[in-house]
């Protein structure tokens, strides 16, 4: 539970200490497009010469705000395995509120690790809290 994590962090933070948090900024268009068909997301050659292809399929659940991701691995053109990742999506105003409700002061909110300003096109939500 996110609130339990925030409570543990707050209890371990020294007075004046900083809490850094990064989270994806949900991109609804990307999620919707990802539900339509399996898409190639990576292709590479391993050190031992195997050709690896990764295809992704996503399914977003509105009720739980979980994006269920499947990565289908192909090695040398043959299907090998599936890896699943369930990712809870936290929307910007939601996460801002959760941090404040749990006693954190948001000092900075960036759109990436380069400390660029957070905006509609930001891939990340990077927080510096106290």
Predicted stretch roles:
Residues 1-2, 121:
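Residues at alpha-helix caps and immediate loop-helix transition turns in enzyme cores, especially N-
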Residues 3-18:
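A short glycine-rich, Lys/Arg-flanked "PGG" loop and its adjoining helix->strand segment in the class I
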Residues 19-20, 106:
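A short hydrophobic/small-residue beta-strand
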Residues 20-93:
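SAM-dependent methyltransferase
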Residues 86-130:
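C-terminal lobe and adjacent flexible extensions of AdoMet/dcAdoMet transferase-like proteins
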């Amino acid at each position: 539970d996110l609130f339990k994590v925030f409570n543990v962090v707050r209890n371990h933070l020294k007075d004046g200490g900083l809490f850094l948090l990064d989270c994806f900024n949900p991109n609804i268009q990307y999620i919707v497009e990802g539900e339509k068909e399996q898409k190639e997301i990576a292709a590479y050659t391993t050190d031992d010469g195997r050709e690896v292809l990764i295809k992704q399929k996503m399914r977003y659940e509105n009720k739980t705000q979980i994006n269920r991701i499947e990565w289908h691995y192909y090695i040398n053109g043959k299907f090998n395995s599936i890896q699943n990742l369930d990712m809870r999506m936290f929307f910007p105003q939601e996460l801002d509120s959760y941090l404040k409700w749990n006693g954190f002061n948001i000092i900075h909110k960036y759109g990436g690790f380069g400390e660029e300003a957070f905006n509609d096109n930001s891939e990340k939500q990077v927080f510096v809290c106290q």
